[in-house]
Design a protein with these regions (language model features):
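C-terminal structural segments of small proteins and small subunits
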Residues: 97-107, 111
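Generic structural detector for well-ordered beta-strands
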Residues: 11-14, 66, 110-112
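Short, residue-level hotspots on alpha-helical faces of the histone-fold
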Residues: 38-42, 46
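Intrinsic-disorder/low-complexity, polar/charged segments enriched in Ser/Thr/Lys/Arg/Asp/Glu/Gln
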Residues: 3-9, 62, 76-78, 90-92, ...
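Catalytic strand-loop segment that frames the active site of acyl-thioester-processing enzymes
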Residues: 1-32
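Conserved small/polar residues in nucleotide/adenosyl-binding loops
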Residues: 114-116
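Hydrophobic beta-strand-centered segment that forms part of the acyl-chain substrate-binding groove
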Residues: 45-78
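Hydrophobic beta-sheet segments that form the core/acyl-binding groove
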Residues: 65-100
Length: 116
């Protein structure tokens, strides 16, 4: 059963494959914003995946995310999520992201439950 308070955590190493330069979102060898978005989304859906009924999944419907600091190759970015509200099919998460030096981003992500 999905209830507010469910938490998740995922980490990813910053490598040449997920930099702004490689992903086409900039010219620098730092963790790309698209990679930050993907990490936030993955952390949220994975935190609730085990509680979903068979044939049920989630899709992202809203994302408000700040990418506030660069993370260079060789460091790790960690995302922590908390399910803050369940409103019918809508799941609302608070996300915070950090690396070894401190905060690098945060915001709100919403998922919608769907039946496949």
């Amino acid at each position: 059963m999905l209830e507010a308070g469910i938490r998740g955590e995922q980490s990813v190493a910053v490598t040449s494959e997920n930099t702004a330069k490689t992903m086409g979102s900039g010219t620098l060898d730092v963790f790309a914003t698209p990679a930050l978005v993907a990490l936030a989304e993955k952390t949220c859906w994975m935190s609730v995946a085990a509680a979903l009924d068979e044939g049920c999944g989630t899709v992202g419907t809203r994302l408000e995310l700040e990418h506030s600091a660069p993370t260079p190759v060789g460091m790790t970015v960690t995302c922590e999520s908390e399910l803050t509200a369940v409103e019918g099919r809508k799941l609302v998460f608070k996300v915070s992201l950090h690396d070894e030096k401190g905060p690098v981003g945060g915001g709100v992500h919403e998922l919608s439950l769907i039946h496949i």
